[in-house]
């Protein structure tokens, strides 16, 4: 919010690398929290924190240099996936499978758009985020309300996300 308010006042506002780094560090703190909240099934908290991280990514996209922007935007699909997953799970808690599926499909479309138009990836369907949302969709349509992922799958996802976020 601070940087947005400054940007609103200053026409030529840009984030320097240090400010971008500080925003990314803040995003990492929120990342760790929303991962924990997801495990605790606090989906409202996940939605709140992922929105915050998407806001951070928007500020970086609008006001940071190219290197900082590229470094940060690679995380956008994952944050969007977590946001979509939490919204979906809330609808499933309300037994609203149709709305849950609508949210999932919209999330997949939005993530594909980011992969194609922001990250310039010609094959977004191969991304781990799309895979996870499709897996959730499959579990909803075939098996009812999804169950917990098997431990091996969770570990594989965590490894992929750690590699993407360079957090190993």
Regions of interest found by a model, annotated:
Residues 108-149:
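Ampipathic, surface-exposed secondary-structure segments
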Residues 40, 94, 161-165:
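Charged, alpha-helical scaffolding/interaction elements associated with membrane systems
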Residues 141-167:
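C-terminal accessory/binding modules appended to enzymatic or scaffolding proteins
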Residues 15-18, 62-78, 116-128:
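Acidic, Ser/Thr-rich low-complexity linear motifs
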Residues 7-11, 60-65, 131-136:
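Short amphipathic alpha-helical segments, especially helix-boundary/capping motifs
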Residues 22-36, 51-54, 58, 74-93, ...:
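Amphipathic alpha-helical repeat scaffolds of TPR domains
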């Amino acid at each position: 919010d601070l940087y947005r308010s400054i940007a609103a006042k200053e026409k030529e506002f840009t984030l320097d690398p240090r400010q971008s780094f500080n925003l990314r560090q803040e995003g990492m703190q929120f990342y760790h929290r929303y991962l924990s909240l997801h495990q605790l099934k606090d989906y409202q908290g996940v939605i709140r924190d992922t929105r915050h991280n998407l806001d951070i990514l928007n500020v970086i996209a609008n006001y940071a240099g190219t290197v900082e922007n590229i470094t940060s935007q690679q995380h956008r699909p994952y944050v969007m996936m977590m946001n979509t997953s939490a919204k979906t799970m809330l609808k499933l808690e309300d037994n609203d499978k149709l709305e849950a599926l609508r949210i999932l499909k919209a999330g997949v479309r939005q993530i594909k758009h980011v992969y194609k138009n922001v990250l310039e990836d010609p094959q977004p369907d191969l991304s781990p985020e799309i895979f996870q949302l499709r897996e959730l969709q499959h579990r909803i349509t075939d098996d009812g309300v999804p169950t917990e992922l098997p431990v091996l799958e969770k570990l594989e996802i965590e490894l992929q996300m750690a590699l993407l976020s360079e957090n190993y």
